[in-house]
Amino acid sequence: MTIVRKPQWLQKKINPAAHAGMEGLLGELRLHTVCQEARCPNITECFRERQATFLILGAACTRLCSFCNVTKQTPIPPDPGEPDRVAEAIRRLGLSHVVITSPTRDDLPDGGAGHYAETVAAIRSASPATTVELLIPDYLGNRESLARVVASAPAIIGHNVETVPRLYQIRAGADYGRSLGVLRTLRELDPVVRSKSGIMLGLGEAEEEVLAVFADLRSVGCSYLSIGQYLAPSKSHHPVREFIPPECFERYRAAALATGFAHVESGPYVRSSYHAARYDGQL
């Protein structure tokens, strides 16, 4: 297999020394972030600015997606004290906007939806001015779980399609149609919900496939979109097939906006929660 080398313009430096303050707070409160667990390349930038995407419901996932660095092992039961600790961290950090996500928890009857709702309620109590964005799994398409999340009334609810339908073998246990169904159901449950999705590029997708995903997302009422470059966390993960140049991301951004998205972030380092407050500014 040919190894695609990372171009010079995609070399982002990570400075662990800049993480100390945030890591101290997270350690004290026994919290996880997707920034750490997913080996996000933006971690230094975000931690330096005292921003973080909180990972609730533990750090172990019940699925085996070949692109993801989150641990694949038997998950622990939900921690009933976690919502309050997340809320305390947000209060101390003084966050105006926060993103909450989790591993997929197919082992739980509601997929963890109730824990999400409890976390939103705790944040509202501790930090009423903070707007909350949730990035949720598919809950196996369970409408009751989705209704529980919608009823918690976050500012934005995200669910990522991740890639084009042809490449869905990288998402073990997922289904493209089901993910579109999640976004459709969110809109059915709350016609004014602000929904969001994300797609990674560089996995071998064709441009026409990407544009078709944009159209599919708009057809189910998706409001916001993030487009970023896939970066393999390690050699054992799914390989990068192509590094997409910045000008292509700009072209995709223009195409997505033309289909009717209210806001689009598109660039090599864009991730679902990267610059998340920019989407919130569209509310």
From Swiss-Prot:
Coiled coil, from the record: none
This protein's pathway: Protein modification; protein lipoylation via endogenous pathway; protein N(6)-(lipoyl)lysine from octanoyl-[acyl-carrier-protein]: step 2/2
Disulphide-bonded residues: none
Molecular function (Gene Ontology), one example: 4 iron, 4 sulfur cluster binding
Subcellular location: Cytoplasm
InterPro entries, alphabetized: Aldolase_TIM, Elp3/MiaA/NifB-like_rSAM, Lipoyl_synth, rSAM
Residues that, per the record, bind [4Fe-4S] cluster 1: C35, C40, C46, S273
EC numbers: 2.8.1.8
Residues annotated as binding [4Fe-4S] cluster 2: C61, C65, C68
Keyword terms of this UniProt record: 4Fe-4S, Cytoplasm, Iron, Iron-sulfur, Metal-binding, S-adenosyl-L-methionine, Transferase
Domain annotation Radical SAM core: ranges: 47-262
Pfam families: Radical_SAM
Cofactor(s) required, per the database record: [4Fe-4S] cluster
Major enzyme class: transferase
One GO location term (cellular component): cytoplasm
Family: Belongs to the radical SAM superfamily. Lipoyl synthase family.
Protein name as annotated: Lipoyl synthase
Organism: Geobacter metallireducens (strain ATCC 53774 / DSM 7210 / GS-15)
